[in-house]
């Protein structure tokens, strides 16, 4: 578990803490990035892109007793095509096979803005997602959905590599 921002949190609201990305990239276990305010967890949004780290997140949510009795929404921001639908259905089937109360939502728009809007709209308590799936160089040039989600979300985030 780590906080979202360090000692300069009030002065650097547009940046995650300086150690956060380094810790998450090096971690061999999931990392919980705690929100500033405590919020009991009843509803979880799993941000899904079909990648390896997102599949790790699905497997963890399916197998961990921590998620027993919680509502799980698997949300994917992607063009509405057959491939996206199949990937989303596969994730839902895995979760339901493990006894999870899971549903799927295919979202329009850019991943970060569509997912943040969905979290707020559905009032989810926890965001679960894969993290930093691309190289640091690509992140510098294009940006990172993970970083945007950490900055824009007011929820705790459970990250998987």
List PLM regions with ranges.
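Amphipathic coiled-coil/heptad-repeat helices and related helical stalk/stem segments
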Residues: 16, 57, 111-112, 142
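A generic structural micro-environment signature
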Residues: 40, 54, 70-73, 113, ...
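Short, flexible loop segments at the rims of nucleotide/cofactor-binding pockets, characterized by
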Residues: 9-12, 50, 104-106
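Short, highly charged low-complexity linear segments
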Residues: 60-64, 104-105, 153
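Glycine/small-residue-rich hydrophobic helix-like segments
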Residues: 68-138
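Short acidic/Ser/Thr-enriched loop-to-helix initiation segments
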Residues: 13-29, 34-99
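Gly/Ser-rich helix-loop-strand patches that form or flank binding pockets
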Residues: 1-37, 119-161
């Amino acid at each position: 578990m780590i906080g979202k921002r360090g000692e300069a949190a009030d002065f650097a609201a547009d940046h995650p803490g300086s150690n956060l990305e380094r810790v998450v990239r090096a971690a061999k276990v999931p990392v919980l990035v705690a929100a500033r305010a405590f919020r009991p967890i009843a509803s979880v949004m799993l941000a899904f892109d079909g990648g390896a780290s997102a599949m790790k997140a699905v497997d963890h949510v399916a197998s961990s007793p921590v998620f027993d009795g919680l509502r799980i929404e698997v949300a994917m921001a992607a063009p509405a095509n057959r491939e996206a639908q199949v990937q989303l259905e596969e994730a839902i089937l895995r979760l339901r096979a493990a006894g999870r109360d899971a549903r799927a939502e295919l979202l329009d728009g850019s991943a970060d803005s569509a997912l943040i809007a969905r979290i707020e709209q559905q009032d989810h308590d926890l965001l679960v997602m894969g993290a930093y799936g691309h190289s640091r160089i690509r992140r510098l040039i294009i940006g990172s959905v993970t970083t945007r989600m950490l900055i824009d979300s007011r929820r705790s985030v459970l990250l998987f590599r």
